[in-house]
A protein has these predicted regions:
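Charged, cofactor-coupling segments
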Residues: 141-164
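Glycine-rich loops and low-complexity Gly/Arg-rich segments
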Residues: 23-27, 113-115, 121-125, 157-160
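Short amphipathic alpha-helical surface micro-motifs
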Residues: 38-43, 60, 115, 132-133, ...
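Short strand-turn-strand beta-turns centered on an Asx-Gly dipeptide
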Residues: 91-93, 134, 154
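A conserved acidic, glycine/proline-rich C-terminal tail/linker
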Residues: 108-140
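Short, surface-exposed, charged/polar-biased interaction segments
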Residues: 38-45, 49, 126, 136, ...
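Catalytic-core "active-site belt" of small-molecule-metabolizing enzymes
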Residues: 1-107, 158-164
Length: 164
């Protein structure tokens, strides 16, 4: 984040958070599901995200600070370049899923606005320097020791992680 996103007179929107984003990068989140009851996720999933409940860490690729070139429509849209950005995850060379930026609540900036508003509702805020993981293009995977995970996000260098 390039600047704080405090509560304001009106809620944050995808359009209003554009200037708060310093850069965009591919990421793989390391999660610990703590033996969760997956039947409850449909009801509680967004709150788990807002609470950072399962995050054990993340592997980040190179940040692109010229990311606004993907905003190819006058308003933030699922059809702009960021909404159409494609990514795919591989385990040991086999594809295990993929998606597009629009899979993150309709657009990554909509996910960021939601996160900022949720933080504000709790009396908190996103801060300059924060790194925000906004969602996933694939469902959770459960790699085993020795597996090699690779995330390929269009226009970025791939990132790779070996489970030891």
């Amino acid at each position: 984040m390039s600047r704080d996103l405090p509560a304001g007179a009106t809620p944050h929107t995808a359009q209003s958070v554009v200037n708060a984003v310093q850069g965009v990068a591919p990421a793989m989140e390391i999660a610990d599901d703590r033996n969760a009851d997956y039947t409850q996720l449909a009801r509680l999933g967004l709150y788990l995200v807002a609470d950072n409940a399962w995050n054990e860490g993340a592997m980040l690729g190179r940040f692109d600070t010229r990311w606004t070139r993907w905003l190819t429509t006058p308003e933030v849209s699922a059809d702009d370049g960021l909404g159409r950005l494609r990514g795919e995850v591989f385990i040991n060379g086999a594809s295990v899923g993929g998606g597009q930026g629009r899979d993150l609540m309709g657009h990554p900036l909509k996910a960021l606005a939601w996160l900022a508003n949720e933080a504000n509702a709790r009396g908190e805020q996103l801060h300059a320097g924060d790194v925000c993981i906004l969602g996933s293009l694939v469902s959770s995977k459960f790699p085993q020791q020795g597996d090699v995970l690779r995330f390929e996000l269009e226009s970025f260098e791939p990132i790779e992680l070996t489970i030891t």
